[in-house]
């Protein structure tokens, strides 16, 4: 946006902690909170831009389903070619990585900037980072430093980082922090809101067309998701399952030695179920990873 033009943004409010209030001992969504967010932002930074605001649904993000994500994708995509310089989506932290990835793959990397903004606490809490995260998103759009989907987030005792939506990793248990894969965030702001690109970040141009979202269902009945753990009990498989998404240990490994594991992967193959493992980076050279081909396990790329 040039200096003589007024930036125009679209705010899409969806709920989450950033749109919630502490009622007694519980956090619950508050339909008036989106406007409280903008009011608090205005008090601290001023609003020198035009904006529209819509609210397709209000939900704590842990309750999101495929249908919720589909509704958000439809809402965002229907506004990409309007007169906005950027879109800001407020969202809960619990499923932030799912929604940012979904939007990233649906929209691609060649649209107006779409920034997701969350808060670790309700915005009136003294430790809340929601206003700072919003400041990062607005400043990022104002500077015109990227296209596609991003997440603006400030970890405790850190600066605001801008993450590519498809690179964000889930927050660890008991933590308010978010990171990108290999900690290669897109860029960062200093305390004066000057932006610096991360020299270690790299990405290719889109090799495929954006993914369709119209077939996202309430539940993913065809996909079975598993996480590796010691003494793992493998579930029974049925004909409804078409894909298995298996999370690996941190070094990209999973049990490939036990008879139980071998029998499970063999049964999946015989049923025509494709098995994909996440977290196994290219070049991982453990003995167990060498058996992936024998067990018909395919490694997914990082993003």
How would you label these PLM feature ranges?
Residues 7-234, 238-303:
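Active-site histidine-anchored catalytic micro-motif
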Residues 1-6:
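Short, Lys/Arg-enriched N-terminal segments with co-localized hydrophobic residues
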